Structure formats: C-alpha cells, structure tokens
C-alpha cells in the first residue's frame, strides 16, 4: 500500500514551492515521483499541431515523493503516515493526530 496516493492533499517539504499545499494528480511509483496540482510549474515551448497552436504553456512537472508529506486531516500540517488494521482493512493513519487519512 502506498503512503501517498492520487487525490491526497500534500505539503511540499523542500524546493522552490516549500510550504505550499496541493492535490496529487498522478503518482509514478517506479520513478518515486508525483504530479501535484499547482506545484513545480514549469514553462514548456509547445510546437504547433493540427489541434493545438504553438506557444509557451505552463504545466506541472513531477516532484520526488521524498519532498512531499501528507497534510494532516485535522490541522493541515505535514505528517508522516502509518498503517492500522480496522474492520479487517488496512487503513492509513496520520502519525501527528491519529486521524484516518482514507475512509
């Protein structure tokens, strides 16, 4: 089970976006990276295609999972993730407050 999943609210721990919060759009476990909405935005030069015109577009670049932490459901501050079994299911738990992260 992954500690950070698609749809999670995360806080950036280091880099140019340190302290900012965002929602995980995609997780790439093989590369140990994630795409986060509004975080690590870079400008890319787009070549013209039949459907898209040329220009400079802004898009999110992947950020390493070690630079992200789950936002605590209670206070929004960064927390580590633990696991616990409840009703026969393995669930993620915020170490900071003990609150369930999913369901």
From Swiss-Prot:
Keyword rRNA-binding appears in the UniProt entry: yes
Family matches, as Pfam families: KOW, ribosomal_L24
Gene3D superfamilies, alphabetized: 2.30.30.30
Keywords annotated in UniProt: Ribonucleoprotein, Ribosomal protein, RNA-binding, rRNA-binding
GO biological process: translation
GO MF term set: rRNA binding; structural constituent of ribosome
Superkingdom of origin organism: Bacteria
GO cellular component: ribonucleoprotein complex; ribosome
Protein family (similarity comment): Belongs to the universal ribosomal protein uL24 family.
Record function comment: One of two assembly initiator proteins, it binds directly to the 5'-end of the 23S rRNA, where it nucleates assembly of the 50S subunit.
Subunit structure: Part of the 50S ribosomal subunit.
Protein name as annotated: Large ribosomal subunit protein uL24
UniProt organism field: Brucella anthropi (strain ATCC 49188 / DSM 6882 / CCUG 24695 / JCM 21032 / LMG 3331 / NBRC 15819 / NCTC 12168 / Alc 37) (Ochrobactrum anthropi)
Lineage: Bacteria, Pseudomonadati, Pseudomonadota, Alphaproteobacteria, Hyphomicrobiales
Gene: rplX
């Amino acid at each position: 089970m992954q500690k950070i999943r698609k749809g999670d609210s995360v806080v950036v721990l280091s880099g140019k976006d340190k302290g900012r919060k965002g929602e995980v759009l995609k997780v790439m476990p093989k590369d140990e990276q994630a795409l986060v909405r509004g975080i690590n935005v870079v400008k890319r030069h787009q070549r013209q295609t039949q459907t898209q015109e040329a220009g400079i577009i802004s898009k999110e670049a992947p950020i390493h999972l070690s630079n992200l932490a789950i936002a605590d459901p209670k206070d929004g501050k960064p927390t580590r993730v633990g696991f616990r079994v409840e009703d026969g299911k393995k669930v993620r738990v915020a170490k900071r407050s003990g609150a369930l992260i999913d369901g």
